[in-house]
């Protein structure tokens, strides 16, 4: 997340003792908008946990369910967005598919215009992924841009939302109420939601890096009441406050972050998750159910 282009590129003011600006170390960007995120959190770590057939199983083929519409919030420079697109369509490196955009279309947003511009330039599937600059916490802009995209397909909500390592940055910059509102907006916009919350140790590390570099501390860090086991906190907010149901946890990444799949009660009634997917996941030990 970023508030300005200067912050997005990691620039800081020069001092008398410095001729060049310091460069933010990975993870120290105040809004999570570091320029080479995928170098230290590669997409493959998430992909190995997610069944490639997940979306096809959740949304069986029919005119009403195509294309599957996804919302990727906090897409950074698009590396993970593209990787997810290829993964769920079973596309290999260098491979294209003329019908890909008819099967799946992702709207990917980030607050940093520099990162969004890079994502647009490097995207190998311009017909299937749309990148926009958006401060998701700006209600007016969010409503206009997302409604405009959905109306192109005659839809009012997204089939699935992706919130990958974003919740901490919302929480640190907007406080407890901001996190609650962020999850409320997502749950109202998406029938299914895949969330990768950062654990509390990442909060402490992010704050420590800012202090180490002499940057302004996060306004809300010391006053946050929602803390501790952040995966459980996210589950509680989405299920108890926002009417979603936790379907499963696909496991943890190498850097110890859970991949949690939620669905709205309406989705539960109209499109129950296939039992075959559940059983296959259990057999592969890739899906751990929180209710067990």
Curated annotation (Swiss-Prot):
InterPro entries cross-referenced by the UniProt entry: Bin3-like, Bin3_C, BIN3_SAM-bd_dom, SAM-dependent_MTases_sf
One GO term (biological process): negative regulation of pre-miRNA processing
Coiled coil: none
GO cellular component annotations of the record: cytoplasm
Swiss-Prot/TrEMBL keywords: Cytoplasm, Methyltransferase, S-adenosyl-L-methionine, Transferase
Family matches, as Pfam families: Bin3
Binding site for S-adenosyl-L-methionine: 46, 76, 110, 135-136, 164
EC code(s) of this entry: 2.1.1.-
Catalytic activity: a 5'-end 5'-phospho-ribonucleoside-RNA + S-adenosyl-L-methionine = a 5'-end (5'-methylphospho)-ribonucleoside-RNA + S-adenosyl-L-homocysteine; a 5'-end 5'-phospho-ribonucleoside-RNA + 2 S-adenosyl-L-methionine = a 5'-end (5'-bismethylphospho)-ribonucleoside-RNA + 2 S-adenosyl-L-homocysteine
UniProt keyword Nucleotidyltransferase present: no
Disordered: annotated segments: 1-22
PROSITE patterns for this protein: BIN3_SAM (PS51515)
Residue ranges occupied by any Bin3-type SAM domain in the UniProt entry: 53-274
EC class of the enzyme, as a word: transferase
GO molecular function, one term: small RNA 2'-O-methyltransferase activity
Localization terms from the record: Cytoplasm
Subunit structure: Interacts with DICER1; the interaction may be mediated by RNA.
Primary role: O-methyltransferase that specifically monomethylates 5'-monophosphate of cytoplasmic histidyl tRNA (tRNA(His)), acting as a capping enzyme by protecting tRNA(His) from cleavage by DICER1. Also able, with less efficiently, to methylate the 5' monophosphate of a subset of pre-miRNAs, acting as a negative regulator of miRNA processing. The 5' monophosphate of pre-miRNAs is recognized by DICER1 and is required for pre-miRNAs processing: methylation at this position reduces the processing of pre-miRNAs by DICER1.
Family note: Belongs to the methyltransferase superfamily.
Protein known as: RNA 5'-monophosphate methyltransferase
Origin species: Bos taurus (Bovine)
Gene this chain is encoded by: BCDIN3D
């Amino acid at each position: 997340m970023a508030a300005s282009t200067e912050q997005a590129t990691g620039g800081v003011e020069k001092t008398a003792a410095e001729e060049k600006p310091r460069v933010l170390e990975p993870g120290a960007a105040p809004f999570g908008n570091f320029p080479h995120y995928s170098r230290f959190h590669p997409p493959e770590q998430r992909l190995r946990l997610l069944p490639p057939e997940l979306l096809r199983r959740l949304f069986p083929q029919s005119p009403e369910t195509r294309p599957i519409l996804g919302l990727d919030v906090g897409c950074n420079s698009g590396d993970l967005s593209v990787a997810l697109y290829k993964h769920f369509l079973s596309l290999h490196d260098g491979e294209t598919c003329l019908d890909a955009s008819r099967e799946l279309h992702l709207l990917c947003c980030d607050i940093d215009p520099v990162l969004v511009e890079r994502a647009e330039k490097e995207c190998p599937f311009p017909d299937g992924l749309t990148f926009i600059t958006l401060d998701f916490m700006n209600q007016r802009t969010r409503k206009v841009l997302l409604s405009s995209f959905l109306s192109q397909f005659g839809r009012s909500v997204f089939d699935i939302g992706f919130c990958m390592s974003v919740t901490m940055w919302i929480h640190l910059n907007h406080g407890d109420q901001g996190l609650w509102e962020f999850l409320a907006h997502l749950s109202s916009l998406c029938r299914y939601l895949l969330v990768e919350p950062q654990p509390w140790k990442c909060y402490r590390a992010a704050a420590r890096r800012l202090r180490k570099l002499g940057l302004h501390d996060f306004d809300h860090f010391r006053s946050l009441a929602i803390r501790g086991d952040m995966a459980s906190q996210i589950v509680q907010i989405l299920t108890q406050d926002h009417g979603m149901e936790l379907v499963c946890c696909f496991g943890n990444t190498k850097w110890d972050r859970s991949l949690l799949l939620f669905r709205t009660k309406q989705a539960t009634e109209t499109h129950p998750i296939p039992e075959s997917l559940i059983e296959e996941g259990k057999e592969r030990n890739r899906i751990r159910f929180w209710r067990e």
